[in-house]
Amino acid sequence: MNVKLFDSELKIMNVLWKEGDTTAKHISDVLKEETGWNMNTTYTLIKRCIKKGAIERSEPNFMCHALIAREEVQAAEAGELLDKIFDGAVDKMFAALIGGKKLSKDEIKNLKELVNKLK
């Protein structure tokens, strides 16, 4: 992914990823409730996402469609964090993420499956 999204733009994208294609008005309503943003703020951020190629706009009703998948953004953000904070060391990043947390049996099983796929 070559599109860098800021936290405010990710809020817009999260609404689209959660709800699917929807109107700018609906995104504005959701984010007014969640963040207190007014309609102008939300529309400005939607337009910024459109310019970046993250959202496609269509008429009628200023319909918005996500052009970037959540997983693509997650992978790019995780990769950036890995490089910036952990000098590319996956094991150090993983240890920091897990910390002293207790993992469920399902989480452990899923992690083992991921590691086995890498072998």
Residue ranges and their predicted role:
Residues 3-8, 60-79:
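Short, cationic-aromatic polyanion-contact patches
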Residues 76-119:
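Amphipathic alpha-helical dimerization/coiled-coil segments
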Residues 12, 46-50:
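Basic amphipathic alpha-helical segments that dock to polyanions
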Residues 10-14, 26:
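Pre-recognition alpha-helix immediately N-terminal to the DNA-recognition helix
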Residues 50-59:
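A short, conserved structural fragment
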Residues 22-30:
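Short acidic, hydrophobic short linear motifs in intrinsically disordered regions
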Residues 16-20:
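Short helix-to-turn junction characteristic of helix-turn-helix DNA-binding domains
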Residues 29-37:
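Short helix-coil junctions and helix-kink-helix linkers
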